[in-house]
Amino acid sequence: SMVENAPAIFLLSEMDGNTIYFCRAFNSMEEVIEYRQSRWGENGWNSKVSEKWRESVGEDPWKGTGADVVMNHMFRMRTDLSYLPEGTNLDEELPNNPYRRHVNIAVDWGKRGEFIENIKAGIENDKKLNNDYIRFMFQPIFGGIDGGDFMMVVLGESRASYFTGLEKRTAKREADGDWQKIQANPIATWVNEESLMITY
C-alpha cells in the first residue's frame, strides 16, 4: 500500500523442488525504469518499506528457514512468438490455468532468425490444426538460464490436463505434412524445464 503504481505481483512455486520465484510484471520497459527510479532513486520508497518490514517481522525473518536468494532475472515477452487461439480472454483463462511448464531453449549458433521463422510457421500451423492451448515466449534481458536464448511458458489447468492436451496436439501435428517440414531440421535444443504452479 506504500508503493504507487505497483506492478502486478505473482509467485511461481516449483512442483518438483523447493524453488519459489517472486515475480513482477510490467507492460513496458518504461514502466520498469519508472518503477526502479521510484524505488531506488533519490527519495525512493525502498528504505521506508524496508523499515516497516523490519518493524513487522524483525531483523532476520528468514533465520532458520534455509532460504537462499539466488539471482534476479528479467525477461521480455515476445508476443510475435506467443500462441493464443483467436478469441482468447486472458482475464478468464489465466486464473483457470495455474499450471506452468517452463522450457528454456538454446538456439544453434547463427540460427536465431531461422528459429524465429520456424516458431512463427508453427503458430500458423497450430491455427490451421485448431490446436487449443496458450503459450507465451520470453527472451532474457539479463539473468536467465545458462545457454537459454528463449523461455517457452505453456499453461494448463493442472500438470495432468496439460500433458493430456499436449498428447492430443502432438498427434495432430505428427499427422500433418506441413508440421513435419517445419520440424525437419532441428536448430534448437531444450536446456531445461520446470513444472510450476502460479499464485496471484
Provide a role label for each language-model segment.
Residues S1-Y200:
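Short S/T/G/P-rich N-terminal loop/turn motif that feeds into the first structured element of a domain
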